[in-house]
Regions:
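Double-stranded beta-helix
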Residues: 98-138, 243-280
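Conserved metal-binding segment of the jelly-roll/cupin
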Residues: 75-95, 106, 216-237
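Short, structured patches in soluble enzyme cores that scaffold and shape functional sites
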Residues: 86, 94, 103-107, 142-145, ...
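Extended, compositionally biased flexible segments
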Residues: 27-28, 33-94
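Conserved hydrophobic/aromatic beta-strand scaffold that supports enzyme active sites
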Residues: 26-30, 81-83, 103, 155-159, ...
């Protein structure tokens, strides 16, 4: 499902118990300097990631100050994040002139400890090639390095490095719990383009070798991935970014099932298996 960009007024774009992706939660919070946003999400662990600007985050009296390194857009610096336990009372205060801050969440009933992930701790994976139109960079905020400290939530930022490139290919899905072949992970994306008048295409193919759906995605588009194979592409001449939220049903580690029709392409894309190993 595609949600076109709109002014959400700091209210969740993907709220708890969403009909399509009930394992996910997503909000975009926009604040001016000194403004405050308070929240608590029962039954969901969350992660606060400034897209732009700098904030302080207080979680039940534990303070994480000066979070965020980016100025004008998501290309302007490295990401940082703070993990907030399930149901915790969180206060975000804008410390820069303005901020746009993402709040990602996954359904989880246990209470863990809060922690921050600063830019030096971001786990970077780069794979693909310009020749195969799959050159991609992934910055894991809550990834394999945080395994054991987080319940079900995976948070990352994905950059399509080559202009006119593809992401999420070879096509894969993760909509059914059937280990060891696949896990169920609901997924939510928020897209940005450089320049911001760029756009792209999100495919969603429900069954192998049957026609699926395609969505025109623009700067600020949100996609809910509930079922099926889901590659996406950016127009030539533009770069694409998408903030990625994964919430697992029974485990945190993601097991992707690659589409049989295109599985041989796994052997043509440099470094792709290293990428797969990082979603743990």
């Amino acid at each position: 499902m595609h949600i076109a960009p709109y002014e959400n007024l700091n209210k969740p774009i993907v709220d708890v118990h969403n009909e399509l992706v009930p394992l996910n939660y997503f909000n975009i919070v926009k604040l001016n300097k000194g403004e405050v946003f308070d929240y608590s999400v029962d039954g969901y662990e969350t992660c606060i990631v400034p897209a732009t600007g700098k904030v302080s985050v207080d979680i039940e009296g534990m303070n994480f100050d000066q979070l965020g390194n980016r100025g004008t857009d998501v290309w302007d610096g490295e990401p940082e994040g703070v993990y907030a336990p399930t149901g915790a009372k969180v206060r975000i205060v804008c410390q820069s002139d303005t901020t746009e801050t993402f709040i990602a969440g996954a359904k989880f009933d246990k209470i863990l400890e809060p922690f921050d992930v600063r830019n030096a701790e971001i786990d970077l994976v780069q794979y693909g090639s310009d020749e195969t139109k799959t050159h991609r960079k992934i910055k894991h905020i809550l990834g394999a390095n945080q395994h054991g400290k987080v319940g079900r939530l995976l948070v990352s930022e994905l950059f399509t490095v080559g202009q006119g490139g593809w992401s999420g290919f070879p096509s894969h899905k993760h909509d059914t719990d059937r280990l060891p072949d696949e896990t169920r992970h609901d997924e939510t994306y928020n897209f940005r383009f450089k320049p911001n008048y760029g756009s792209g295409l999100q495919m969603l193919q429900r069954e192998d070798n049957k026609a699926g759906d395609a969505y025109h995605i623009v700067d600020g588009s949100t996609m809910l991935i509930d079922k099926g194979y889901h590659p996406c592409a950016v127009l030539p001449g533009y770069e694409m970014y998408y903030f990625t939220i994964l919430g697992g049903l029974s485990q945190r580690s993601l097991k992707q099932y690659f589409q049989p029709t295109h599985e041989e392409q796994l052997h043509t894309i440099p470094g792709i298996m290293d990428m797969v190993a990082k979603f743990k």
